[in-house]
Swiss-Prot record:
Name of the protein in question: Sensor protein NarQ homolog
An annotated GO BP: signal transduction
Gene field: narQ
Protein location: Cell inner membrane
Cross-referenced NCBIfam families: PRK10935.1 (NF008184)
Biological role stated in the UniProt entry: Probable member of a two-component regulatory system. It is not known what protein it phosphorylates and in which regulatory pathway it acts, as the narL and other nar genes do not exist in H.influenzae.
EC number assigned by the record: 2.7.13.3
Catalytic activity: ATP + protein L-histidine = ADP + protein N-phospho-L-histidine
InterPro entries: HAMP_dom (IPR003660), HATPase_C_sf (IPR036890), His_kinase_dom (IPR005467), NarX-like_N (IPR029095), NarX-like_N_sf (IPR042295), Sensor_HK_TwoCompSys (IPR050482), Sig_transdc_His_kin_NarX/NarQ (IPR016380), Sig_transdc_His_kin_sub3_dim/P (IPR011712)
SMART domains on file: HAMP (SM00304), HATPase_c (SM00387)
Amino acid sequence: MYTKGSVSTRIAKYLFIILIVAGVISSLSLAIMSSNKYDAEAINISGSLRMQSYRLLYEMQEQPESVETNLRRYHISLHSSALLEVQNQFFTPNVLKHSYQNILQRWTNMEKYARQQDVKNYSKQLTDYVADVDYFVFELQRFSEQKWILGVSVLGFAMLLILLMVSYVIWYTNREVVKPLHLMTKASMQVQMRQFNHIPLDTRKQNELGTLARVFTQMSTELGQLYSRLEEAVNEKTQKLRQTNRTLSTLYQSAQLLNTNTINDKILNQVLNYIFISDHLNFVKVEVMGAEHWDITLGKQDANNELQIETLSVDNEELGVLSWQAGLPCPDPRIMQNLAQMLARALYFHKNLRQKEQLLLMEERSIIARELHDSLAQVLSFLQIQLTLLKHNLKKEDEQSKEKSLAIIANFEQALSGGYAQLRELLATFRLTIQEANLQLALKQVIDSLRSQTTMQMNVNCQLPSQSLNPQQLVHVLQIVREATTNAIKHSQGTVIEISARINAEGEYEILVEDDGVGIPNLEEPEGHYGLNIMAERCRQLNAQLHIHRREQGGTQVKITLPHTLY
């Protein structure tokens, strides 16, 4: 992406300029160095011109025949390519060129004297000619030195220029790239630490770093706004969760108070007071129908505020009214609705519980009345008959009447003792059913209460479910078991009594009382004894079957067979 004032473009331009300068300087240095290639040869050749000119003078005097050969050599040296190359260089100084032309002109005259073997004129001009050659050699050496100095100067200037340009590029890069990136790094670390108001970045620059700074600043600003919104949302959710938790806690505490205690005006007052405080209510009132003494009011009603009302009802049965006025902060309407439902259910269950208690009380009274009628009423009827006979015999004074009277009194005492014993057993059974409704434990309690009356071993084995019988059925079963066990203790003359409760092959409940004694002779009861009849009557009320018979291995078995479904 092109950006006005691009840092990368400017750095690229600077580097390109440095490359161009380095290329130019390198080319110039190479040109200077290449121009020095013939300088040494030219200096050597020009220096040899002096020796050759003296040699020609000697040969003119001593060996005239070799002068022509040396002249050709001299001509070759004087017009050598090294000297011509130096003369043809575009930056050769004019002094050097004039000096070379002067040597050429003088050598024209000198060559003429040499060819004419004119030793006198040749030697006369030789001194000046050698002086000109020496001057040419001097100028040639100075020109070579100047070129080396120029080359070194150019290289030095180039190095200095490149160094300055590189320094500028470094300074520019540090100012335009490194420092902004360093600031941006600090800013990013601050953003990472949730400090969205980071150090200011230079967003005015129209380059890549300026664009990046603007984008980063905008991003951090948006992140800060987003974080603030998220923080507000989290705080709002946290507040709602706290409110929900407080609501659930309030409902839980209210439910605990209503479910774990017998509801009354004190419990209702505790629940309403808890709601009144926790939900910042200004006014709350509950009215219970049929129990006006339970009406509770907390706070003061404000006539200017709306009164909210919830009817306490279950299955369209209206039980009361809950009304309230909210304070600040306003409570969740659902908590008051749930509270109204809990209060309605609690009042409904309390009402049903009271009704069930009344029914149970009436049923218990009915059971007691029936038991008293089945046991004691027959004894009292027998006593009344005996008392009538006794009164009749007392009117007679003969000896036989007295004996009958004594027999009646004995029967009277026996019946009275038996009735008293039945009353104690009946009371023990009622206490047992009240204290323990579990069949197995109730059987054990009955048998344990009889252990003091005998030395026989008595074992209980109950395989029926613990809640197989309701309280009324349990009373009948326990009375039958007590009566059968008492008969075995009194009449069996055995050593072991087995009491078992199980489910037979047909799926019926069976309760067995077995002993290993002499066995029952028959099912006829003596006069004044009604135990077997009472057992049979109880079985009829249970819709059960009673079987009493002698066992083949000895002893008596009393078996009660009950249908599987009793309720």
